[in-house]
Curated annotation (Swiss-Prot):
<feature type="binding site">
    <location>
        <position position="86"/>
    </location>
    <ligand>
        <name>Mg(2+) 2</name>
    </ligand>
</feature>
<comment type="similarity">
    <text>Belongs to the inositol monophosphatase superfamily.</text>
</comment>
<feature type="binding site">
    <location>
        <position position="214"/>
    </location>
    <ligand>
        <name>substrate</name>
    </ligand>
</feature>
<feature type="binding site">
    <location>
        <position position="69"/>
    </location>
    <ligand>
        <name>Mg(2+) 1</name>
    </ligand>
</feature>
<dbReference type="GO" id="GO:0046872">
    <property type="term" value="F:metal ion binding"/>
</dbReference>
<keyword id="KW-0479">Metal-binding</keyword>
<dbReference type="GO" id="GO:0007165">
    <property type="term" value="P:signal transduction"/>
</dbReference>
<feature type="binding site">
    <location>
        <position position="185"/>
    </location>
    <ligand>
        <name>substrate</name>
    </ligand>
</feature>
<dbReference type="GO" id="GO:0046854">
    <property type="term" value="P:phosphatidylinositol phosphate biosynthetic process"/>
</dbReference>
<protein>
    <recommendedName>
        <fullName>Inositol-1-monophosphatase</fullName>
        <ecNumber>3.1.3.25</ecNumber>
    </recommendedName>
</protein>
<keyword id="KW-0460">Magnesium</keyword>
<dbReference type="InterPro" id="IPR000760">
    <property type="entry name" value="Inositol_monophosphatase-like"/>
</dbReference>
<feature type="binding site">
    <location>
        <begin position="88"/>
        <end position="91"/>
    </location>
    <ligand>
        <name>substrate</name>
    </ligand>
</feature>
<dbReference type="InterPro" id="IPR033942">
    <property type="entry name" value="IMPase"/>
</dbReference>
<dbReference type="InterPro" id="IPR020583">
    <property type="entry name" value="Inositol_monoP_metal-BS"/>
</dbReference>
<dbReference type="InterPro" id="IPR022337">
    <property type="entry name" value="Inositol_monophosphatase_SuhB"/>
</dbReference>
<feature type="binding site">
    <location>
        <position position="86"/>
    </location>
    <ligand>
        <name>Mg(2+) 1</name>
    </ligand>
</feature>
Length: 266
């Protein structure tokens, strides 16, 4: 596959940060037996990865803005472009030695996502997409799953964790979805879960209370793999709403209808 100069910049940045995270992940696995625990070490690894990515991207395109999970937003001087970065999506998995985490980098141009990279350093799976150019896993072209019936579908999701609200609402949605689908998976890394939708591994996905860096790259991967996405309320703007429902068009629309069912009266 041929990549543009901008996509190559993104790929090289995530590869460099990925080498750092892979080394740190090996150390975290060794720290699992420590009573002190690896939490502080993981926080340092997260910040270090973002610093590497920011330096690489800003070196290549110094006029672009930068929005990352770990630091304050940098406003770009060109006013049109912005990098959107999650240096370690799946921190809890990383902390516990579970190899399901990713680096997510998206390029936004005048409000539209035009480039995407999601990379899992533990598996060397690199997901890339450019607007109008398709989505790829390493060098393999991606297509979303073809299943049309929820009863045949495996659906990914994310659960509200400690410190977040909406637990009750989520449990109602989960109960509704459980009654309609073949299976539900909660993997713990939204950007990688969205990449799984693009690859056809998940037939669909939904989650609320997400930040832009959780979704930006995954949204383009899904679109370029022939998928469809909206927010949980059906407004069509996941990044603004902070929620997402996605899959192929049949699955995503059916899934959104299910999660919109009213809360049953007691």
């Amino acid at each position: 596959m041929a990549r543009s100069a901008l996509l190559n910049v993104m790929v090289q940045a995530v590869f460099k940060a990925g080498k750092s995270l892979a080394r740190d992940f090996g150390e975290v696995q060794n720290l699992q037996v420590s009573l002190k625990g690896p939490a502080d070490y993981v926080s340092q690894a997260d910040r270090k990865a973002e610093r590497i990515i920011r330096e690489e991207l800003m070196k290549a395109r110094p006029t672009y803005g930068f929005l990352g999970e770990e630091g304050e937003e940098i406003k770009g001087t060109d006013g049109a472009h912005r990098w959107i970065v999650d240096p370690l999506d799946g921190t809890t998995n990383f902390l516990h030695g579970i190899p399901h985490f990713a680096i997510s980098v998206a390029l936004e141009r005048q409000g539209e996502i035009v480039g995407a990279v999601v990379f899992n350093p533990a598996t060397d799976e690199l997901y890339t997409a450019e607007r109008g150019g398709g989505a790829f896993l390493n060098d393999r072209r991606l297509r979303v799953g073809a299943r049309k019936a929820l009863s045949d579908a495996v659906i990914g999701t994310g659960t509200p964790h400690l410190g977040r609200g909406n637990h009750g609402k989520y449990l109602v949605e989960l109960r509704h979805v459980m009654g309609e689908v073949a299976g539900i998976r909660r993997m713990g890394s939204a950007s990688l879960d969205l990449a799984y939708v693009a690859a056809g591994r998940f037939d669909g996905f939904w989650e609320r209370d997400l930040a832009a860096w959780d979704m930006a790259a995954g949204l383009l991967l899904i679109r370029e793999a022939g998928g469809w996405s909206t927010d949980a309320e059906g407004g069509g703007k996941p990044l603004e709403a902070g929620s997402i429902v996605c899959g192929n068009e049949h699955i995503a629309k059916a899934l959104r209808e299910v999660i919109q069912r009213p809360i049953p009266s007691k």
